[in-house]
Amino acid sequence: MTSATPQPGQLIVITGPSGVGKGTLLRQLRQRHPELALSVSATTRPPRPTEVAGVDYYFVSVEEFKAMIAAGQLLEWAEFAGHYYGTPRQPLVQLIAQGKTVILEIELQGARQVRQSYPQARHIFILPPSLAELEHRLRSRGQDSEEAIARRLAQAETEIAAAPEFDVQIVNDDLEKSLIALETAIFSPAP
């Protein structure tokens, strides 16, 4: 386990295809490093059975989400798989001002938007070992239709092609090794 201290007040952007294991990695990371702050996104999608409102996401209606966009309350937002996702601006700004290291897990389009506002943020891309393994993981979740899985896999190919845009790429083929690589990326001094 890496024990170095991250740079105060920094933003870490984590992106990767749906089903790549971002959530699992972040849960493990937070257990090891409770000092890290996790940005909570807003979404219009319904909660999954294990998700907690206000902890995993702020679950809002499409109308509420559009009002947040109109009021400039979102740092970034995107539509993905038929639902809206976005990052409420004010909590993120407050956490960074308090010197916290904030982890922001978002989709590719959102990561590109954040780079415009926070060019100094560290951008990390989580890759699957292969598309076949990604498909296996998506099917194992048992929550998507065949059509949704096909859509997510097609989107994954586009996202994977963008991985070189990111400061660090981590192939999530072994949880512990991936977690160590993620810790190294977060806690190492910026180049």
Swiss-Prot record:
GO terms for molecular function: ATP binding; guanylate kinase activity. SUPFAM superfamilies: P-loop containing nucleoside triphosphate hydrolases (SSF52540). It catalyses: GMP + ATP = GDP + ADP. Belongs to the guanylate kinase family. It comes from Thermosynechococcus vestitus (strain NIES-2133 / IAM M-273 / BP-1). InterPro entries: GK/Ca_channel_bsu, Guanylate_kin-like_dom, Guanylate_kinase, Guanylate_kinase_CS, P-loop_NTPase. One of its GO terms (cellular component) is cytosol. The keyword ATP-binding applies. It comes from the Bacteria. Keywords: ATP-binding, Cytoplasm, Kinase, Nucleotide-binding, Transferase. HAMAP family: Guanylate_kinase. ATP binds at G16, P17, S18, G19, V20, G21, K22, G23. Residues 9-187 form the Guanylate kinase-like domain. Essential for recycling GMP and indirectly, cGMP. Its main location: cytoplasm. The gene is gmk. SMART domains: GuKc (SM00072). CDD domains: GMPK (cd00071). This is Guanylate kinase. Its EC number is 2.7.4.8. It is found in: Cytoplasm.
